[in-house]
Each structure stands twice: as structure tokens, then as C-alpha cells.
Amino acid sequence: TDADWAKQVLKLTKRKGADLVIDFLAGSLFNQTMSVTKIAGTVVNVGRMAGETGEIDFDQHSMRRICYKGVSFRTRNPDEIATVIQAAKQALIPALAEGKIQLPIDAIYPFDQFNAAFDKMKANQHFGKIVLSL
């Protein structure tokens, strides 16, 4: 991970912050996530890689008027899950294909080293995707 990620986001957005933040981290990093969210922006939490709990700066949350949504498949039925997946495919695949969205790749492992890749992921030592090559 890059300790200066918040500074990088603010630099890229000319200090305005992002309209939408897809948050895989939460936990102890949530206040940093709010700091890079545009005023009246939205944070959608889809993971808790930095912890399931943490302190929240409610003043920052209120002052920035951030809309926060938590997302989990654990409480959805199969039809809801299928609908979400289909909508994500329609929105994300074209954006990925056109280069509008780029996914950071942390590491590429040969398939026969999948245990090492899994260990890295389990230890939360990556920033971005871990790819297995065939």
C-alpha cells in the first residue's frame, strides 16, 4: 500500500475529492477515505480490509455531507445478487475495455505459486489485484 494514497487522490482531483469512492478498506482508514470524498460525495463500502471497526470523525462526515452506503451479498437473496452482478457487468466492463477504469495490479504469480499468492492476500499485504497466470 502507498501511505500517501490520500494525497495522490486529492492531487488527481485538484483537491476537490472524488464524487464516488468504492471503499474496500474501512476500519482505521475510513476517516482518510472521507477526506478524499468530494463534498456531497458518496462512499460505498464493499470491504473491511483495514478492519471491521474504527473511529469515525462525525464532524468530517457531516461537514462534507457524505452519503455512506454499506454493501454486502450476505443479506441478499440469489435474485438480488444476480441483478447486482448484471448491472455491474453492464456498467464496468465497457469502462474497463475503454480504459476509463484501471485496476491496480499488485503482483502476478505463476499458477503453480497460487499458495504464495493466497498467503499474500490473506495477510492483506497487497494493494490492488493479485493475478495468477496460466
Regions found by a protein language model. Give the residues of each.
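Glycine- and other small-residue-rich loops at beta-strand/loop junctions that grip anionic moieties
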Residues: 19-23, 46-47, 106-107
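Glycine-rich phosphate-binding loop and adjacent beta-alpha segment
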Residues: 28-100, 133-134
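C-terminal capping/lid region of NAD(P)-dependent oxidoreductase domains
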Residues: 15, 98-107, 115-134
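Short acidic-hydrophobic, aromatic-tinged amphipathic segments that line or gate anion-handling sites
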Residues: 1-4, 108-113
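Adenosine-nucleotide cofactor-binding segment
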Residues: 1-29, 81-83
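Alpha-helical elements of Rossmann-like donor-binding domains used by nucleotide-donor carbohydrate transfer enzymes
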Residues: 8, 20, 32, 87, ...
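Conserved functional loop/turn residues at catalytic and ligand-binding sites
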Residues: 13, 17, 25, 60, ...
